[in-house]
Amino acid sequence: MNFDSFWRQLQIGGHTPKGDRYRIDGDRLHIQTSGSRNEKYHITRETVRRYFEEIPQMSGPTFRHRFSNRFYRVYAHVTGEPDRS
């Protein structure tokens, strides 16, 4: 999957198996967690692109530790990669 098709899937929006909701609003990816704090998180398209390109370069746990577990759950769901978080 290339970045443009990944972004198109994000524009559709949805839920991860862990219940996080995601959607695109303008040029930002918004992720709302399903946890008790119901935290909201958003990042720009440029950051999404950088994360999309960096994830294959490192293991999932390393990416989640250095950057964002929330984004990784969405990435794993959209790309079909197993989510080991």
Where are these regions (language model features)?
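Intrinsically disordered, charged low-complexity linkers and terminal tails
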Residues: 1-85
